């Protein structure tokens, strides 16, 4: 193409660039075999909510099937151990379902016989007050599975007359502060709540520019969008494996309205926690 006036910059056609684009286009074309592999992987990564006893899928979302006024979600081993010791041992809880999922870090293929070291995601309600729900989730829910998890649990149009409490942990090195993280009294709690959550938190609120991650962030964002009162308690710790001091760092939450009345005997619960830690140490010891 010739220039039409002096000084005009003319781009000469480049065949090499065209060939590269054609090769990229061919690479993007999906073969029937590729499509089949992709569909199989998508089916494998599908999140399913099951009745644990019958292994059949729930026809509707969990909270559409059961009315809920209070929902406590523990995500990660230390948060799960806290609920197991202080909440579940203070009342009679009935299992209503479990999540089955598969990803790079989680294989919840068999949830019938679980030990404290296995990954799982199980839902319960309190027999004396069935509108109080609890979720223990020690498995990793991948980014592409989080929306599925929310849909299966909350549904597409959730009720707003319930309160959500989320407990989880992050490593203290994820905490952004002008101070040295080595000088921080680890473990420590921070809270983040939705606009509709009006109760006071039992610890300082999470400071900017700190952010939350993974499933806890997805649940809190979902609650913010749907105007559901929700609060996330985040324990920053330097020990991410099951740890007595980290679990006990959640204790201030026992005085909040969300958990008040669910814990009857704190000294007894502390003893149960110590037994749980001892059992876990024995199971984790390769020499026993």
Swiss-Prot record:
Stretches for region Disordered: 13-35
Cleaved signal peptide residues: none
GO cellular component assignments: cytoplasm; cytosol; endoplasmic reticulum; Golgi apparatus; nucleoplasm; nucleus; protein folding chaperone complex
Modified residues (N6-acetyllysine): 264
N-acetylalanine PTM positions: 2
Gene Ontology molecular function terms on file: molecular adaptor activity; proteasome binding
Matching InterPro entries: Proteasome_assmbl_chp_1
Subcellular location: Cytoplasm; Endoplasmic reticulum
List of residues that carry Phosphothreonine: 18, 54
One Pfam family, short name: PAC1
Tissue: In the adult, detected in brain, colon, leukocytes, breast and testis. Widely expressed in the fetus. Also expressed in a variety of proliferating cell lines.
Gene Ontology biological process terms from the UniProt entry: cerebellar granule cell precursor proliferation; chaperone-mediated protein complex assembly; proteasome core complex assembly
The keyword Acetylation is annotated on this UniProt entry: yes
Post-translational modification: Degraded by the proteasome upon completion of 20S proteasome maturation.
Domain of life: Eukaryota
Alphabetical UniProt keywords: Acetylation, Chaperone, Cytoplasm, Endoplasmic reticulum, Phosphoprotein
Basic and acidic residues bias: start-end ranges: 26-35
Modified residues (Phosphoserine): 180
Function: Chaperone protein which promotes assembly of the 20S proteasome as part of a heterodimer with PSMG2. The PSMG1-PSMG2 heterodimer binds to the PSMA5 and PSMA7 proteasome subunits, promotes assembly of the proteasome alpha subunits into the heteroheptameric alpha ring and prevents alpha ring dimerization.
Stated family: Belongs to the PSMG1 family.
Quaternary data: Forms a heterodimer with PSMG2. The PSMG1-PSMG2 heterodimer interacts directly with the PSMA5 and PSMA7 proteasome alpha subunits.
Protein name according to UniProt: Proteasome assembly chaperone 1
Protein species of origin: Homo sapiens
Recorded name of the encoding gene: PSMG1
């Amino acid at each position: 193409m010739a220039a039409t006036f002096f000084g005009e910059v003319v781009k000469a056609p480049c065949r090499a660039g065209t060939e590269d684009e054609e090769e990229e286009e061919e690479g993007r074309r999906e073969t029937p075999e590729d499509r089949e592999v992709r569909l199989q992987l998508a089916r494998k990564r599908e999140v399913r909510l099951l009745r644990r006893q019958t292994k059949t899928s729930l026809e509707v979302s969990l909270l559409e099937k059961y009315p809920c006024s209070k929902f406590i979600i523990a995500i990660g081993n230390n948060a799960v151990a806290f609920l197991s010791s202080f909440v579940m041992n203070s009342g009679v809880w009935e299992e209503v379902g479990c999540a089955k999922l598969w990803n790079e870090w989680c294989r919840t293929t068999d949830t019938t016989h679980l030990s404290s070291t296995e990954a799982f995601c199980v839902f319960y309600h309190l027999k004396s007050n069935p509108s109080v729900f609890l979720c223990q989730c020690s498995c990793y829910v991948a980014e592409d599975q989080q929306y599925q998890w929310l849909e299966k649990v909350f549904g597409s149009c959730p009720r707003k007359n319930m309160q959500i409490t989320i407990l989880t942990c992050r490593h203290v090195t994820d905490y952004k502060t002008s101070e040295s993280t080595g000088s921080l009294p680890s473990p420590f709690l921070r809270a983040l709540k939705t606009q509709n959550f009006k109760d006071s938190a039992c610890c300082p609120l999470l400071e900017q520019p700190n952010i939350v991650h993974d499933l806890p962030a997805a649940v809190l964002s979902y609650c913010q969008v749907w105007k559901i009162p929700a609060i996330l308690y985040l324990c920053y710790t330097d020990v991410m494996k099951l740890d007595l001091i980290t679990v006990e760092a959640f204790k201030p939450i026992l005085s909040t309205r969300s958990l008040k009345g669910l814990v009857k005997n704190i000294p007894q619960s502390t003893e149960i926690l110590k037994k749980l830690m001892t059992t876990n140490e024995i199971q984790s010891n390769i020499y026993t």
